[in-house]
Amino acid sequence: MALVGVDFQAPLRIVSRVQFGILGPEEIKRMSVAHVEFPEVYENGKPKLGGLMDPRQGVIDRRGRCMTCAGNLTDCPGHFGHLELAKPVFHIGFLTKTLKILRCVCFYCGRLLIDKSAPRVLEILKKTGTNSKKRLTMIYDLCKAKSVCEGAAEKEEGMPDDPDDPMNDGKKVAGGCGRYQPSYRRVGIDINAEWKKNVNEDTQERKIMLTAERVLEVFQQITDEDILVIGMDPQFARPEWMICTVLPVPPLAVRPAVVTFGSAKNQDDLTHKLSDIIKTNQQLQRNEANGAAAHVLTDDVRLLQFHVATLVDNCIPGLPTATQKGGRPLKSIKQRLKGKEGRIRGNLMGKRVDFSARTVITADPNLPIDTVGVPRTIAQNLTFPEIVTPFNVDKLQELVNRGDTQYPGAKYIIRENGARVDLRYHPRAADLHLQPGYRVERHMKDGDIIVFNRQPTLHKMSMMGHRVKILPWSTFRMNLSVTSPYNADFDGDEMNLHLPQSLETRAEIEEIAMVPRQLITPQANKPVMGIVQDTLCAVRMMTKRDVFIDWPFMMDLLMYLPTWDGKVPQPAILKPKPLWTGKQVFSLIIPGNVNVLRTHSTHPDSEDSGPYKWISPGDTKVIIEHGELLSGIVCSKTVGKSAGNLLHVVTLELGYEIAANFYSHIQTVINAWLIREGHTIGIGDTIADQATYLDIQNTIRKAKQDVVDVIEKAHNDDLEPTPGNTLRQTFENKVNQILNDARDRTGSSAQKSLSEFNNFKSMVVSGSKGSKINISQVIACVGQQNVEGKRIPFGFRHRTLPHFIKDDYGPESKGFVENSYLAGLTPSEFFFHAMGGREGLIDTAVKTAETGYIQRRLIKAMESVMVNYDGTVRNSLAQMVQLRYGEDGLDGMWVENQNMPTMKPNNAVFERDFRMDLTDNKFLRKNYSEDVVREIQESEDGISLVESEWSQLEEDRRLLRKIFPRGDAKIVLPCNLQRLIWNAQKIFKVDLRKPVNLSPLHVISGVRELSKKLIIVSGNDEISKQAQYNATLLMNILLRSTLCTKNMCTKSKLNSEAFDWLLGEIESRFQQAIAQPGEMVGALAAQSLGEPATQMTLNTFHYAGVSAKNVTLGVPRLKEIINVSKTLKTPSLTVFLTGAAAKDPEKAKDVLCKLEHTTLKKVTCNTAIYYDPDPKNTVIAEDEEWVSIFYEMPDHDLSRTSPWLLRIELDRKRMVDKKLTMEMIADRIHGGFGNDVHTIYTDDNAEKLVFRLRIAGEDKGEAQEEQVDKMEDDVFLRCIEANMLSDLTLQGIPAISKVYMNQPNTDDKKRIIITPEGGFKSVADWILETDGTALLRVLSERQIDPVRTTSNDICEIFEVLGIEAVRKAIEREMDNVISFDGSYVNYRHLALLCDVMTAKGHLMAITRHGINRQEVGALMRCSFEETVDILMEAAVHAEEDPVKGVSENIMLGQLARCGTGCFDLVLDVEKCKYGMEIPQNVVMGGGFYGSFAGSPSNREFSPAHSPWNSGVTPTYAGAAWSPTTGGMSPGAGFSPAGNTDGGASPFNEGGWSPASPGDPLGALSPRTPSYGGMSPGVYSPSSPQFSMTSPHYSPTSPSYSPTSPAAGQSPVSPSYSPTSPSYSPTSPSYSPTSPSYSPTSPSYSPTSPSYSPTSPSYSPSSPSYSPSSPSYSPSSPRYSPTSPTYSPTSPTYSPTSPTYSPTSPTYSPTSPSYESGGGYSPSSPKYSPSSPTYSPTSPSYSPTSPQYSPTSPQYSPSSPTYTPSSPTYNPTSPRGFSSPQYSPTSPTYSPTSPSYTPSSPQYSPTSPTYTPSPSEQPGTSAQYSPTSPTYSPSSPTYSPASPSYSPSSPTYDPNS
């Protein structure tokens, strides 16, 4: 509710901890309001007291009231009742715990079974301080072994010995009863106890069923100390409470009855269940009272037990589910809580909200990107509560009078006491009267801030802030560029809109979540939006070389460009008629000084090198220099979504707001051009010429013939299988290769045939729609259809469709589509095509569910990880995850890809380009000016400085090559130096041919100073220093190498001014790029990883023609990694070799054989069993010869061998391949079977390799007896054969089933070495890849590189190499998965995930087994999975949740400590009282004037110098405006009409005259950018618009009588009366006391140190504020302080403003507010007593003046200077209108200074926009001093006579 605090006056406490526990029977009775004892609900049509709908438990129907609290249906929350059970029963949720505790204590005396004082126990208690769950587990493990309650026997023996012995004392206490313990088993919902040993109880049976009653007795005997030892809590969770004796009856609100029309009420499931319990309970009581048989009672108790159990959980395994009469299972309490739709996830974590709208979206290219068009019907329905203040009462009164029926109206008035007046039902006129403090719920109007969202919300750019524009009709309209972050299209998508209900929310959305602020995504540091669709297509067409635009059309286009400055550029062609090129028009759209180099999509790489690399014949090199498109065709590479493109650069260089306008302007102008130009596509575009078709047919015919040939070869067995593949795989690969090749060849010939003007092609080339493949499929041939990565499989009887013959492997039968879409498919082709398409659809559907779950798990695992104020990254338990975010402490949004100039070049080039030689005079003279050369020659340490620079560069290069041994890493850093240097060259007009005046010594010292300022980790201790070094190492290396002396004097040629500007710019941009504390980087990382996962393919196929090994990729691999799976689909090692093995394939083969597991089966050709009784004379003819030779020297006793013979013939080829010898195999057989098998074998060189094996039997004598159970020899031999073939390992590692050997052809697997010359060289070593992993065994092999060899099984890496290695392995594996399909995710997100998974020192899986085993609070865990189990566990162990995380706070409806909620604000409430003085005499006087002191919400009262935002809250940029509407802007009076530009409030930037009854425009023009009294052109007496004779300003006009307290009139400025207490005679904007602006603000004076006239755009403290940039004017209304573009040089921040008074962070302590003190206290160092402005002799500063206190420079009416007749411009009066701080003696404003004439302190007469007469022009602006280089007096645009161009801001100009 937006109205908390209005409706409910009671203050709300913040929940700081949540204590879990079990409700004990006493407490249940205490909180109960009714004892429920009857199962009936009604009696005589009335709710029955003591029944299940007891009226004391809550309200029953709409009209009723609650008997307990007398509330009605909306107010009464419901109250618990209770019902007492006749017998105790088990609580099903606690059953497992009950069992555990039974096993820990003695069944008879309730003692712990272990000695509490035993060291083991004490250690456990110490170890598990707060973790009681762990404690129970460990104690339970100790007790499990005990079967006797110890202590009885020892007690008797020990006593006589030594009664004083402390041990005995302990024994006495610990002594148990010495009886044997039963073992317990759970059966269903019963517990059975069984005694194993013969118990000394004579009659007791050995096995009984424990009743809950008996267990309760045991539990009641446990002492409080023991309760603590078993991890429970005597106060909150006692063991006996786990047994139910009293049941709470939930309130009626929890189980409402459903009233169906025409029939009785349907009671809720819980009510039914409770009624069953009561009935059973009554029956049990009756039977007990009547003394029924024991078995009857037992049955009743079991039934009661069943009902109580199913009330809690209705899905108990082994129990029937309780059902309603109809057979529908009842919904138990557990089912109500768990799952997506349950209470936790469905109602607490996520709720349905009010003030939201949903409808279909439609495109509208004319809306700005941050605007959404809202239908009027929605605007009329959604309201915003606006607080009535004296400033907006008129406006709101008007809305209220219109009511709800007319559009800009209001729905409700909410009075201060919370009463609502509904304006729909014609209320009395008196009710409509508004008073300050009321709230008006007004309709949504233009300019409101809303949140727009499209599900699925995969990343933070799926919910962004927009502004509203009310449009007719019924759909949301949005700009096309914004569709990409939302992933929306206009084929019927719906989107949601939320209207925030408080100013704080609006401010937050506006300052953080608006679309322009999200242009760059931290996910991949690139823009998320680009130009799309028709605009993209047109921008390519328009920027081609041959596009010309004539004069009328040019005028038309300029009309569409809002930022046009009124100058038409020189046309490119003058005769015969003026023509402009398309490039010129595009240059007009580009804002400001941007420099970009890109290529067009068709750019050939060959053009980038060679002597003519600057010449681009196809106009494919896009060069934008100084905001001018010089060459190149603009396509999606320049204005799309790629990193480093034009849009990216504009956003980084000029700020998000200009970038946002740029998006909109491109669209309006280009679309206007396209409407005239036209773009269409038809069948004509798809038709190629005759020759092409012939070519295509021939290609396909040839391909089909090739396939037939391959099939022939396969039939004839001529096809050699490729290594690692079977014959069939090889065949398929070959065929696939042929067919894919055919498709590609036909496609490329089709594309070649299309002309330059083909519309298909123009869309593909510009990147707006389609790809090359689409073209070739439409024109040439659709190609091979695949299912599961293979050709269409045979369906039945060896055919794909009935139309083909059996075993047809031809292209047509297996799914090759040779027709194009244009020609149309044959029926069978169509069928195959549909098969391929269907698979795609299924894949997508399955993938969506998979990735959605992955995303949820990632978010849940990392949701509370955030950057803290100490710069570390921690989770909600404040456990450190990273020392610095992303290891460099920078925000992913501000970094860019940069290249390290020193990494790649070899030594010679490196020395040539980076080594400076100060002794080379010729070089110095050529590159440096005389002064510099002299300085170098005179300096004594110059040479050593330059030498130290060189050695530092060499060291940097060595480090770089160590960090990036491959030399090709993508280095991501802030501040793109190359571009900054380029900007500097443009701004300072650097001439690259002249020598420079920048001394090399200055360069070295400058760079060193700068690198000291780039602080990520502050602190002077050793650790901090090292951390700082690590975090900024790369940045420093980049700085030193790019800004080295040699580079500066030969390539960049910056002069010293430019160099200083550059250093300052780097520093401020680096500061800006530091990650903000409070940033929720965990959620960001989870989204950044989850979002690309949805784009991945689900199944990765074994691609055709690849013989290398197949690895799991895509979503399945991602799942394996984050689940930390123990068993992978394709476990694999990548083995790198060293020494000779790496180079020599034979040696590599040796290693391969050592690794690959080889069984006998793999080398066997065939086996056979023969009956061959005589060993010497064999029956097998071919063996005779070698057998007889073998037995010539008999060394065995042949009499015992069996007559059966196993003959194994081996495959010679495979033996050689595996490098095996016969001897090795014989050894293995001998090793396996010993002497039981008699083996003979042929020589290695024999024709056939044969083994002959016989069983060596025992002596004949023994054999007879055992004959019975012995199997026959031949059967036994068969078993041996099977065993030998499969299990006999010949060599290798059993886990590694196959090893592939290959020589890598891609660089990522090659070995990169650094040559002696210092260059990089990649060497293709042999590498082995395996199926199966055994890292430990492999690492111990010889000739293996143990450093690079790695496994893809992260569990194995953890076991073998430890946690740090596995962190790197996860990072590498994740990177492989993501980059496989060309995505890129910034390293910091991957690193964060790896750190979260490994921070604890073990692998934490991102599943319930990992996330829910952390020590976070129970509330967070139960919001993920296993809801009820976790809550039960928490109750048993009396856990406490500290409510620190995100989920817990959301569940409790509190602000989570994250983002803007992670800090507190200090507010001086006393000061706030003086914040807003509203003179009572003007409150109802037609217009309202507020003092300019500032409301409490204004920035002057905000925490002044929190280190991050140099002293301003993000919300209110204005000086003083009312909390609701921002009615007062710093200089622009009150605006009754909302949305005009100017002013400073973000909402209605109004600038109207305070009260002007007649003129609709008021005294100010509606768009004036907040200039007050004497501000230029607003109230100047001679200005034609506001002349004294103007009817509205006649002194006789009733509302302007000079003495009227409301609107007095001074002779010059009609609206200021001297007696009006709040209006000072000078305009508030330029008054000396106005904190927001003082003309002497040092930032603009030529003497100011920070504003050097030669360096217009840089002041040391300003991140990127350049006065020459058109939109950063002092008056630009929408600039927030945290915006990078605000800077101390903006007038609102003048250093004299109290916010910056150096002696006090916010304002000076002696000044209660800036109405009365303005922060200028005498102790403030800027105001010394000698300052001429405050001289005591000044006539206006009389200490005796009643209203002038020395600390408060107020204007008081009694001050002599301020009589209405006071001369307006009194040069001698330091307090005249002329200048509040002007005095003739002031050194800055000396009358002799040419720029300052006495009548004009601010504008010099030479400034082209200034005329020295007091009537100032509208265009004057404090920003331009005559010396400012960017502002030349001759510039025709800013002529004094041109009324509408204010140099400060073309958009918001005073007079338009």
Swiss-Prot record:
Binding positions for Mg(2+) 1 per the UniProt entry: 489, 491, 493
UniProt PTM: The tandem 7 residues repeats in the C-terminal domain (CTD) can be highly phosphorylated. The phosphorylation activates Pol II. Phosphorylation occurs mainly at residues 'Ser-2' and 'Ser-5' of the heptapeptide repeat and starts at the 3- to 4-cell embryonic stage. This phosphorylation also occurs in the early stages of oocyte development and is not detected in oocytes arrested at the meiotic diakinesis stage. In the somatic lineage, phosphorylation at 'Ser-2' is mediated by cdk-12 downstream of cdk-9 whereas in the germline lineage cdk-12 phosphorylates 'Ser-2' independently of cdk-9.
GO CC field: chromosome; euchromatin; mitochondrion; nuclear body; nucleus; RNA polymerase II, core complex
Chain positions covered by the region annotation Bridging helix: 827-839
Coiled-coil residues: none
EC code(s) of this entry: 2.7.7.6
Region ranges (Disordered): 1523-1856
Gene Ontology molecular function: any one: metal ion binding
Location of this chain's protein in the cell: Nucleus; Chromosome
Reactions accelerated catalytically: RNA(n) + a ribonucleoside 5'-triphosphate = RNA(n+1) + diphosphate
Sequence segments annotated as region (Rudder loop): 314-331
Gene disruption: observed consequences: RNAi-mediated knockdown results in embryonic arrest at the 100-cell stage and prevents the embryonic transcription of several genes. Surviving embryos exhibit gastrulation defects with decreased expression of genes involved in gastrulation.
Keywords, alphabetical: Chromosome, DNA-binding, DNA-directed RNA polymerase, Isopeptide bond, Magnesium, Metal-binding, Nucleotidyltransferase, Nucleus, Phosphoprotein, Repeat, Transcription, Transferase, Ubl conjugation, Zinc
Residue numbers binding Zn(2+) 1: 66, 69, 76, 79
Binding of Zn(2+) 2, residues: 106, 109, 149, 177
GO BP annotations, alphabetical order: DNA-templated transcription; embryo development ending in birth or egg hatching; gastrulation; mRNA transcription by RNA polymerase II; transcription by RNA polymerase II
Span list, region Lid loop: 256-268
Region called C-terminal domain (CTD), residue ranges: 1593-1816
Sequence repeat boundaries on the chain: 1593-1599, 1600-1606, 1616-1622, 1623-1629, 1630-1636, 1637-1643, 1644-1650, 1651-1657, 1658-1664, 1665-1671, 1672-1678, 1679-1685, 1686-1692, 1693-1699, 1700-1706, 1707-1713, 1720-1726, 1727-1733, 1734-1740, 1741-1747, 1748-1754, 1755-1761, 1769-1775, 1782-1788, 1789-1795, 1796-1802, 1803-1809, 1810-1816
Annotated residues for binding of Mg(2+) 2: 489, 491
Chief site of localization: nucleus
Quaternary structure and interacting proteins, as annotated: Component of the RNA polymerase II (Pol II) complex consisting of 12 subunits. Interacts with sig-7.
Physiological role: DNA-dependent RNA polymerase catalyzes the transcription of DNA into RNA using the four ribonucleoside triphosphates as substrates. Largest and catalytic component of RNA polymerase II which synthesizes mRNA precursors and many functional non-coding RNAs. Forms the polymerase active center together with the second largest subunit. Pol II is the central component of the basal RNA polymerase II transcription machinery. It is composed of mobile elements that move relative to each other.
Protein family according to the UniProt entry: Belongs to the RNA polymerase beta' chain family.
Protein name: DNA-directed RNA polymerase II subunit RPB1
Gene that specifies this protein: ama-1
